């Protein structure tokens, strides 16, 4: 080269370096271009422009030596004189450019038309993501109504699933054979409810306006008398939603229907954990839930003779007894010789009773008119001692 032969005294005078600084830079520049040529990759234009300028400068120096001062050839090298704001060129163009940001660099050859090797070429592109298109294309699962109907048909049980045509979401009611876990607690009504016809089940499931609210927590639909308009007893339906709560409390609708047939008498709820003396006696007494009812909410409205009605009316008028329950002095009227008669007529040990309710009076469930008096008595009966907790309604005469 021309610069290699010109002015060697700068480095040769000391006998240490055979080339000057500018000559060494030119050699590095030419070696970098040779690497690009050997790897078969196109040479960047930044490496070619300094060669053109140096060629023009050398030709100018040959014609007019005055242009050699000041030393301008050192300013013409691309990566040093022109590219101050640019990145340094790759010293090894055919090598994979994957680095760790420090000294390490991949030693493999770069893939054709790429900066990286086959191992590092697709890094960071194919992430593990869930295919959204596949989840959207899957068909929706069959509805609960169709599944319940199919299972009932295969099991040989008449399907009683009902759905609503309103825009609200549909609810389905389990089949009667799904009520097996409840038979241990509720007894007769559930055991007898499995023998219902499909027509009767469909009727009870359609006439009730509270169908959507109650079917979700109870295996059987509410009875047909829920379709009546009971404005003052609307609170009673909310308590029915709690599982098993109707074994202790009842709503005003049941009381009113019972008093329509039984007058001012009281009716008893089912016992919990006790067994009747006779196997033929239903779990619910005659004045409570009917064991042949189509729903656990149904009440056995059997007709009682006139003597029974008069006896119950006299019982309410003659009862008077003091009892301390929960630290309060609560008073209840009770006849003296009624304990043995009640124990003989009602062999079940009832846990909760309910006060009689007048049909024409305004109900007092949540602290309305009237007073509520409770008493606990331990009558001395012929059999083992039944403990009865009675909740009655006291009417001011």
Swiss-Prot record:
The keyword Nucleus applies. Keywords: Activator, Nucleus, Transcription, Transcription regulation. Residues 90-134 form the WRC domain. It is found in: Nucleus. Residues 144-174 have a biased composition (Low complexity). One of its GO terms (molecular function) is ATP binding. InterPro entries: Gln-Leu-Gln_QLQ, GRF, WRC_dom. PROSITE patterns: QLQ (PS51666), WRC (PS51667). One of its GO terms (biological process) is regulation of DNA-templated transcription. It comes from the Eukaryota. The keyword Kinase does not apply. Residues 18-53 form the QLQ domain. GO terms for cellular component: nucleus. Its main location: nucleus. PANTHER family: GROWTH-REGULATING FACTOR 5 (PTHR31602), GROWTH-REGULATING FACTOR 6 (PTHR31602:SF46). Transcription activator that plays a regulatory role in gibberellin-induced stem elongation. Belongs to the GRF family. The QLQ domain and WRC domain may be involved in protein-protein interaction and DNA-binding, respectively. This is Growth-regulating factor 1. It comes from Oryza sativa subsp. japonica (Rice).
């Amino acid at each position: 080269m021309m610069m290699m032969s010109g002015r060697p005294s700068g480095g040769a005078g000391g006998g240490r370096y055979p080339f000057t600084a500018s000559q060494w830079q030119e050699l590095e520049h030419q070696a970098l271009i040779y690497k690009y040529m050997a790897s078969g990759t196109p040479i960047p234009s930044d490496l070619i422009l300094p060669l053109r300028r140096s060629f023009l400068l050398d030709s100018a120096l040959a014609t007019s030596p005055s242009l050699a001062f000041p030393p301008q050839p050192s300013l013409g090298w691309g990566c040093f004189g022109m590219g101050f704001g640019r990145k340094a060129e790759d010293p090894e163009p055919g090598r994979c450019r994957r680095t760790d940001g420090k000294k390490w660099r991949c030693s493999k050859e770069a893939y054709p038309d790429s900066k990286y090797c086959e191992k590092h070429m697709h890094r960071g592109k194919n992430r593990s993501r869930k295919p959204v298109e596949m989840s959207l294309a899957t068909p929706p699962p069959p509805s609960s109504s169709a599944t319940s109907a199919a299972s009932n048909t295969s099991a040989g049980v008449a399907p009683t699933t009902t759905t609503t045509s309103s825009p609200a979401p549909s609810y389905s009611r389990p089949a009667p054979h799904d009520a097996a876990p409840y038979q241990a607690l509720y007894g007769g009504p559930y055991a007898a409810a499995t023998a219902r016809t499909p027509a009767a089940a469909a009727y009870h499931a359609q006439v009730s306006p509270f169908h959507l609210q109650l079917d979700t927590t109870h295996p059987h639909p509410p009875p047909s008398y829920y379709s009546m308009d009971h404005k003052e007893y609307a609170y009673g339906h909310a308590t029915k939603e709690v599982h098993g709560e109707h074994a202790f409390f009842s709503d005003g609708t049941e009381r009113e229907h019972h008093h329509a047939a039984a007058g001012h008498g009281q009716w008893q709820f089912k016992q919990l954990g006790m067994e009747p003396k006779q196997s033929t006696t239903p779990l619910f007494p005659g004045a409570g839930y009917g064991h042949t009812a189509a729903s656990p909410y149904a009440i056995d409205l059997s007709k009682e003779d006139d003597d029974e009605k008069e006896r119950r009316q006299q019982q309410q008028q003659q009862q008077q007894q003091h009892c301390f329950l929960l630290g309060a002095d609560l008073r209840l009227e009770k006849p003296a010789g009624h304990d043995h008669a009640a124990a003989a007529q009602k062999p079940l040990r009832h846990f909760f009773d309910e006060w009689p309710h007048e049909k024409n009076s305004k109900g007092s469930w949540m602290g309305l008119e009237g007073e509520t008096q409770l008493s606990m008595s331990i009558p001395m009966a012929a059999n083992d001692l039944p403990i009865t907790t009675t909740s009655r309604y006291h009417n001011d005469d």
